[in-house]
Amino acid sequence: YYSGYDRTFNLSGINVYGHGSDISFPNVDVVYGYRKTDVFGLGGVFLSDWFILRYVLGYFSTIDKNNSIERPSSFNPVYYDSLHFTYPLMEEAKYFQSTFQIETELPFGINLVAQYFSHDTLTYSSDSLPVDQEIDIPNLEIDPNEMKPSNFFTPGMGVPLAILTDRAFFLTLDKEMLDEQLKLSFTSMIDASSIDKKEISSDGESSKEHSSKGLLMELKMTYSLNQNLDGTIAITKINGDSSHPEGDSYPFNQMEDFSHLRFELKYFF
């Protein structure tokens, strides 16, 4: 059991400011905060001569304790001197996460680690955001038609991957050679989530389940130049999903530009 505040901030509400009684040119201020989260965890390990199995389950109960977000305007407070509207979200949610992992050694001294991760929001509640115009939030474009607080909910504790997807497969293969001076590794992450996709035909509008196709792969080689210095070369490739219903908002589509080739030198003191 663990209780604490989330490590990542969340959308806590929106304030609308004006100049005196005039709200002709309002300033919309987005307020962030950190939810309080209680965590209940359960895990187990099974060992055999051939493989190792690990399982971890976490149940999370989180609440935004900011019942009031009233405060002076952070932008030009001399002009925007009056708070006209305030919309605290007061989020509450319960969600769970689980990981199942198997570790084994393959022929030729290759180590394999395979993992399945899942996340599900069990319940969610919040106040509404009665906003009828587009709002500019850093790194987030909000369409009034999609202005549902549940669309912006992200877990603040647990596996960080839950921000990207609710289900994923991991696979890691690595091998050490030359008296453990050289290490080769291959890592992949496959998005296994699904989402309803609306389709319009002559028979009307229908909903069809779409399986996500996001994929991340990395091939890495690390060589120990001496006891204190390692050199690494790695290639990372990220594939999105051009047919995903979320379009450019799909996280793997956003990450495609982060595909790269990198070189590293690490010195250990």
Question: Can you say where each PLM-predicted feature lies in the sequence?
Answer:
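Residues that define the transmembrane beta-barrel architecture of outer-membrane proteins
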Residues: 36-40, 92-98, 165-169, 213-215, ...
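Outer-membrane beta-barrel "beta-signal"
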Residues: 171, 253-269
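Repeated loop/turn-to-beta-strand initiation elements of outer-membrane beta-barrel proteins
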Residues: 50-54, 109-113, 179-185, 227-233
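Transmembrane beta-strands of outer-membrane beta-barrel pores
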Residues: 2-6, 48-50, 59-63, 116-122, ...
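Extracellular loop and loop/strand-boundary signature of outer-membrane beta-barrel proteins
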Residues: 26-30, 79-89, 155-160, 195-207, ...
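Outer-membrane beta-barrel translocator domains and adjoining extracellular loop/strand segments
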Residues: 9-17, 65-74, 124-131, 188, ...
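Outer-membrane beta-barrel architecture
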Residues: 43-45, 99-103, 172-174, 220, ...
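Long, internal scaffold/assembly segments composed of regular secondary structure
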Residues: 1-94
